[in-house]
């Protein structure tokens, strides 16, 4: 009677990445062979990259040392080029070591294939000696970097760094006053909040208010006086579209503001500046408009907390405030727009009691996007859309019915063919 074959001990295959009890015959299975061939092909591509730096040694930058790394499948070791002066120097020395050769033989004897491919996965000592001589031709490893920018003293294949350094050298050679003399006329960012500073130049011809900026025509204003603009030696001729150093605009001499004219609230003129228009920090309470024309929103109004617009005495204000529901009193009084909300509640109570309130807020401050974005539900918006669609179909049908219909007799293909002949 034949005895059953004894099973081998369970072991882990590093190539297939699973445990098995098949023993030494596992390396002849098709799955193991395919996994082994793909693993060795990946390692051949890695060692080919290392051989490239073996023939062409190049200096390794400190910021690239952590990225230059190789995983050795035979030694189960991650080779990181930390502290290396040349690219793949540690990997070259590792692949030429005797321990690496020993691990290759153990791996191939356990997992296959034959031993005739050992030289494909290692580097000979003769190649390492040639590489060391080439590295010595670069000079000392400590003097391989030149300057704080990391520019190489020897030859380098890094064209991006070379171009970057050449660009920086060209920029440094350009004088500062040449750069300042070419100011762009692009849109500048807001210097102040919309509700803090408003430019009042309504009397000046050629000035158009557009949001928080001014559009001025060059033909309306001459150049400013260079001697008195207070910019020092390299003075810049400032046109009407250009900003000055403090955010003001250049205008005609007949609109100059002298230093002695302090009666305007919020106006300020720096000493030594001639030909500058005064900018008033006071905001006109009668100004309307929407968000595009620079009007302040009602919750950021400068008169928050001031009920002067509501023409009532203190007793009436206290009486209307007492009518506010108790749950609203629990809200944070320092929240955004709290003063505007309180004022609006009082105005609503006044409207209910019959008082007439004056409001300077433009109802079109925010643009009207229509339908569900402005008011109403999605269902109501859909009904409005369907009504408009039906009206459009009716108008199209009426326009088509108005045209006279031409009725033509049917002509067969044979008759058309004969008439064509």
UniProtKB/Swiss-Prot annotation:
Tissue: Also present in cotyledons, hypocotyls, stems, veins of sepals and stigmas, and actively dividing tissues such as shoot apical meristem, root tips and emerging true leaves. Weak expression in petals and anthers, and not detected in mature leaves. In seeds, expressed in both the endosperm and embryo.
Main location (coarse class): nucleus
Motif (Nuclear localization signal 1): 328-335
GO CC term (a single one): nucleus
Gene Ontology terms for molecular function: zinc ion binding
Record's subcellular location: Nucleus
Ranges for region Disordered: 279-306, 376-421
Keyword annotations from UniProtKB, A to Z: Brassinosteroid signaling pathway, Metal-binding, Nucleus, Phosphoprotein, Repeat, Stress response, Zinc, Zinc-finger
Disruption phenotype: Aborted seed development. Embryos arrested at the globular to heart stage transition and defective endosperm development with multi-nucleolated endosperm cells.
Compositional bias annotation for Basic and acidic residues: 377-389
Record flagged with keyword Protein biosynthesis: no
Known function: Key regulator for endosperm and embryo nuclear divisions.
Other remarks on this protein: At least nine differentially spliced transcript isoforms are produced. Full-length isoforms, but not the truncated ones lacking the C-terminal domain, are able to rescue disruption mutants.
Name of the protein this chain belongs to: TITAN-like protein
Organism name: Arabidopsis thaliana (Mouse-ear cress)
């Amino acid at each position: 009677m034949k005895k059953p074959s004894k099973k081998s001990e369970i072991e882990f295959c590093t190539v297939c990445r699973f445990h098995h009890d098949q023993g030494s015959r596992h390396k002849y299975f098709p799955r193991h062979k395919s996994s082994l061939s793909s693993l060795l092909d990946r390692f051949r591509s890695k060692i080919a990259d290392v051989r490239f730096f073996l023939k062409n040694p190049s200096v390794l930058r400190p910021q690239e040392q952590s990225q230059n790394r190789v995983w050795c499948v035979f030694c189960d070791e991650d080779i990181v080029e930390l502290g290396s002066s040349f690219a793949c120097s540690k990997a070259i020395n590792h692949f030429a070591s005797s321990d690496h050769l020993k691990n290759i033989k153990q791996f191939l004897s356990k997992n296959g294939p034959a031993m005739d491919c050992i030289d494909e996965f290692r580097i000979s000592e003769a190649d390492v000696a040639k590489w060391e001589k080439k590295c010595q031709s670069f000079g000392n490893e400590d003097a391989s970097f030149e300057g704080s920018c990391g520019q190489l003293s020897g030859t380098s294949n890094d064209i991006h760094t070379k171009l970057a350094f050449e660009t920086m050298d060209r920029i440094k050679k350009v004088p500062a006053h040449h750069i300042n003399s070419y100011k762009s006329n692009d849109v500048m960012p807001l210097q102040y909040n919309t509700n803090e500073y408003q430019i009042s130049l309504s009397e000046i011809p050629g000035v158009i208010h557009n949001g928080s900026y001014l559009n001025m025509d060059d033909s309306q204003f001459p150049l400013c006086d260079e001697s008195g603009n207070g910019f020092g030696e390299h003075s810049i001729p400032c046109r009407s579209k250009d900003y000055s150093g403090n955010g003001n605009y250049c205008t005609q001499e007949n609109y100059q503001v002298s230093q002695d004219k302090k009666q305007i609230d919020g106006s300020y003129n720096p000493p030594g500046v001639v030909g500058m228009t005064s900018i008033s920090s006071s905001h006109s309470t009668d100004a309307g408009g929407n968000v595009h024309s620079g009007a302040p929103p009602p919750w950021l109004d400068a008169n928050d907390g001031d009920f002067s617009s509501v023409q009532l005495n203190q007793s009436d204000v206290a009486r209307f405030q007492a009518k506010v529901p108790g749950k609203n009193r629990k809200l944070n009084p320092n929240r955004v727009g709290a003063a505007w909300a309180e004022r609006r509640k009082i105005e609503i109570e006044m409207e209910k009691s019959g008082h007439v309130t004056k409001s300077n807020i433009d109802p079109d401050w925010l643009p009207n996007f229509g339908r569900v974005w402005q008011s109403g539900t999605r269902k109501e918006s859909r009904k409005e859309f369907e009504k408009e669609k039906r009206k459009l179909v009716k108008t199209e049908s009426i326009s088509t019915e108005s045209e006279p219909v031409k009725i033509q007799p049917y002509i067969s293909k044979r008759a058309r063919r004969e008439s064509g002949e």
